[in-house]
């Protein structure tokens, strides 16, 4: 399948509470800046995919909202009471997906993690090409337990189940797992080991610039196309 159009949805927590498992590597202010940089590289990579015709960001954070708009994305308001919701991420994604369905009933919806600084556009293009048109599909993260991306074609609810063991939860809820060599898509960043792994892949320019400033080891990705190659036509 290669859908005519897809809208990507990305949910991002407040920068104040982001990436606590990197506390042993980065100070709080630097963790916030890292989240913002990784988000920027993720959005830029998604925006470079021809089939992705729009990106919507759900966040309570004004800095993320401002960055999203500067990158050409829309900002969807976080659902009321989300701060007290133990399943706030899935509630936010589902709410945004429902709103998108009402506006673009013929488009697919792709829920994407916000911390994929090594993401290459052709990885997402390949995912959308291989995704079924009659059911949801997931791409597991590098550990095989989480979900890097969840796709729902037109007419099928997204039904996000992100969180602990989300890959298993999505599979048991009917989503088909897609298998492909997509290391940048699968490598989210939660721990120091994850940060080292994505540095070995090469990161997008925003993340690379921050790592350079912080004098952490890095490989600079000057442009997405230089390292990833051209995005295949749909």
Regions found by a protein language model. Name each.
Residues 165-234:
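Conserved alpha/beta core of the MobA/IspD/sugar-nucleotide pyrophosphorylase nucleotidyltransferase superfamily
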Residues 148-175:
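Short, glycine-/small-residue-rich phosphate/pyrophosphate-handling segment
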Residues 112:
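Catalytic metal- and UDP-sugar-binding loop of GT-A-like glycosyltransferases, i.e.
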Residues 1-22:
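N-terminal nucleotide-binding beta1-loop-alpha1 segment
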Residues 116-145:
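Conserved donor-nucleotide/metal-binding helix-loop-beta segment in metal-dependent transferases, i.e.
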Residues 51-75:
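Acidic donor-binding segment of Leloir-type glycosyltransferases
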Residues 35-52:
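A short, N-terminal amphipathic alpha-helix
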Residues 67-108, 166:
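Short phosphate-binding loop-to-helix
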């Amino acid at each position: 399948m290669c859908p005519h159009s897809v809208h990507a949805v990305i949910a991002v927590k407040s920068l104040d509470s982001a990436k606590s498992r990197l506390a042993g590597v980065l100070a709080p202010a630097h963790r916030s800046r890292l989240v913002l940089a990784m988000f920027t590289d993720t959005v830029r990579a998604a925006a470079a995919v021809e089939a992705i015709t729009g990106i919507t960001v759900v966040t309570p954070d004004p800095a993320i909202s401002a960055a999203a708009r500067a990158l050409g994305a829309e900002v969807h308001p976080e659902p009321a009471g989300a701060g007290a919701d133990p399943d706030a991420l899935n509630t936010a994604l589902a709410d945004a997906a429902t709103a998108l369905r009402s506006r673009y009933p013929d488009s697919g919806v792709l829920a994407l993690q916000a911390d994929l600084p090594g993401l290459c556009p052709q990885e997402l293009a390949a995912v959308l090409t291989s995704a079924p048109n009659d059911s949801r599909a997931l791409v597991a993260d590098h550990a095989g337990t989480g979900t890097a991306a969840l796709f729902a074609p037109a007419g099928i609810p997204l039904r996000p189940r992100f969180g602990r063991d989300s890959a298993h939860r999505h599979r048991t809820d009917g989503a088909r797992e897609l298998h492909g060599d997509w290391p940048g898509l699968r490598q989210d960043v939660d721990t120091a080991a994850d940060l080292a792994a994505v540095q070995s892949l090469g990161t997008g320019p925003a993340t690379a610039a921050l790592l350079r400033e912080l004098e952490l080891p890095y490989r600079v990705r000057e442009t997405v196309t230089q390292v990833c190659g051209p995005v295949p036509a749909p």
